[in-house]
């Protein structure tokens, strides 16, 4: 394959450049590239990324195993596959996404032709999290490249093996003036956020998201914030309980619960609670093993990313047990391995910290209810979650919940897998996020939608000053009949 000259690999590394040097280099290159980085160049860039990822898949699996023992199959399904799917989807649809759009004519400007054009925002910053460090670095990169931007990626320092590999992959595929990786801790993020990027894409906690938005306000950079929250699951009386249990176990305990759209807690109708709990525990045993020793040995179970997060999760568990929570499954931990086994708790009360903080770990509170209105009120009294899940065979029950709650997305009789749908926007509401990612929505997030109005035979100049008697009459007619 012949690579366009703009994508020829340079014998240089972002490691040898400061954040400011990388930004300035990309700013100059982005200006020079404007209007010239068309569909052929963008698809070539996406092909390079895809080929490099596929060739280095074993290294990706090894890096994530080294960082927090993520299982190989989970890496393929939740880290690599979504990025490759995003690339393929962008390649298939990019011509249509980039195409100028005609806009309906308006009588007030009769004689003109209106349209929309999508231009790159310019130099963009992607700040990636640690929980899905590969997916959430390269997924947004696909959208940014499809839109024609230059990009700086700041991977999380909490997954150092993966961060180093991300830098290596980027340097193999791209020149620094198109895509660069800048590694470092929070101080490096602050240094980057002080620069006047044209768009910032951040994935992380609401607390840090507010800091990112505050920094962006100083340069008036646009932002996409993919945050989090306590995503509730509601199980109705007519739910298929085995199906609900399978989905919840996979959605909650994959990645050891360290997923922004994982079910945070479960509301289950009291009339089916005991039966559901029994099925749920059996499903955990089937997937991960019957006891602590088996779950520790499981090749399909990840670890907590670091000691700080392990201690936070263990503190939530200890607090809940001390205040009367009942352990239905699990409850054991091993600090030496940063291991918290799949844990299900009942008798969870408002006095417990687990009821208020985003868990972001393998603790699953089960909360019984009698009246769905009380559940809806509780959901609406809190911050708007990134996701909400409903398990029910009753369409009226489902539609009532969907209509009366607000969340970034809703999954009905499934959990988490909506992230994989390339034609759906992915994003939150207020505290759980701003803006959308994936597919055309990601493309538009990294694009400026530019309106263009062209005069063909417009008569609007008849309304220009000086405001003679005739012009005033025309203005009066315009206001009267076109308002």
Swiss-Prot record:
The gene is alkH. Disulfide bonds: none annotated. Transmembrane segments: none annotated. Induction: Induced by AlkS. Belongs to the aldehyde dehydrogenase family. It comes from Ectopseudomonas oleovorans. NAD(+) binds at residues 204-209. This is Aldehyde dehydrogenase. PROSITE patterns: ALDEHYDE_DEHYDR_CYS, ALDEHYDE_DEHYDR_GLU. It comes from the Bacteria. Its EC number is 1.2.1.3. GO terms for molecular function: aldehyde dehydrogenase (NAD+) activity. InterPro entries: Ald_DH/histidinol_DH, Ald_DH_C, Ald_DH_CS_CYS, Ald_DH_CS_GLU, Ald_DH_N, Aldehyde_DH_dom, Aldehyde_DH_NAD(P). The keyword NAD applies. The keyword Oxidoreductase applies. It is an enzyme of class 1 (oxidoreductase). GO terms for cellular component: cytoplasm. Pathway: Hydrocarbon metabolism; alkane degradation. The active site is at residues 226, 260. It catalyses: an aldehyde + NAD(+) + H2O = a carboxylate + NADH + 2 H(+). GO terms for biological process: aldehyde metabolic process; alkane catabolic process. Keywords: NAD, Oxidoreductase, Plasmid.
């Amino acid at each position: 394959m012949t690579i366009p000259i703009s994508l020829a690999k340079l014998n240089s590394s972002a490691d040898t450049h400061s954040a400011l040097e990388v930004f300035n280099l990309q700013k100059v290159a982005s200006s020079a590239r404007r209007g010239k980085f068309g569909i052929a160049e963008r698809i070539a860039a996406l092909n390079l990324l895809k080929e490099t990822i596929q060739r280095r898949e074993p290294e990706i699996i090894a890096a994530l195993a080294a960082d927090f023992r993520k299982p190989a199959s989970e890496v393929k399904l939740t880290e690599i596959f979504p990025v490759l799917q995003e690339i393929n989807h962008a390649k298939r649809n990019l011509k249509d996404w980039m195409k100028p759009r005609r806009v309906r004519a308006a009588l007030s400007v009769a004689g003109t032709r209106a349209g929309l054009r999508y231009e790159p925002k310019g130099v963009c910053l992607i700040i990636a999290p640690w929980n899905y460090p590969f997916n959430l670095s390269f997924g947004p990169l696909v959208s940014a490249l499809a839109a024609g931007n230059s990009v700086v990626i700041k991977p999380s320092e909490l997954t150092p093996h993966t961060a180093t590999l991300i830098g290596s992959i980027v340097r193999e595929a791209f020149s620094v003036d198109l895509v660069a990786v800048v590694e470092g801790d929070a101080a490096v993020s602050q240094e980057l956020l002080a620069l006047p990027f044209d768009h910032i894409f951040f994935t992380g906690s609401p607390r840090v998201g507010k800091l990112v938005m505050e920094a962006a306000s100083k340069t008036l950079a646009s932002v996409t914030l993919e945050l989090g929250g306590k995503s509730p699951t509601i199980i109705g009386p007519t739910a298929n309980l085995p199906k609900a249990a399978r989905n919840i176990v996979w959605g909650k305990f994959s990645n050891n619960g360290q997923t922004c759209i994982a079910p945070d807690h479960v509301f289950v109708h009291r009339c089916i609670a005991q039966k559901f709990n029994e099925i749920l525990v059996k499903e955990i045993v089937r997937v991960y093993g019957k006891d602590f020793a088996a779950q520790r040995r499981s090749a399909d179970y990840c670890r907590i990313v670091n000691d700080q997060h392990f201690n936070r999760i263990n503190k939530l568990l200890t607090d809940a047990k001390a205040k009367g929570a009942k352990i239905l499954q699990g409850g054991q931990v091993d600090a030496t391995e940063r291991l918290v086994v799949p844990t299900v708790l009942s008798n969870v009360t408002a006095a417990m910290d687990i009821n208020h903080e985003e868990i972001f770990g393998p603790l699953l509170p089960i909360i019984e209810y009698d009246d769905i209105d009380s559940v809806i009120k509780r959901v609406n009294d809190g911050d708007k979650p990134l996701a909400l899940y409903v398990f029910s065979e009753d369409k009226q029950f489902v539609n009532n919940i969907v209509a009366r709650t607000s969340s970034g997305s809703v999954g009905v009789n499934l959990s988490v897998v909506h992230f994989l749908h390339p034609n759906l926007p992915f994003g939150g509401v207020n505290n759980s996020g701003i803006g959308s990612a994936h597919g055309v929505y990601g493309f538009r997030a990294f694009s400026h939608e530019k309106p263009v109005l062209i005069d063909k035979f417009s008569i609007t100049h008849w309304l220009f000053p000086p405001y003679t008697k005739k012009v005033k009459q025309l203005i009066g007619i315009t206001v009267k009949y076109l308002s």
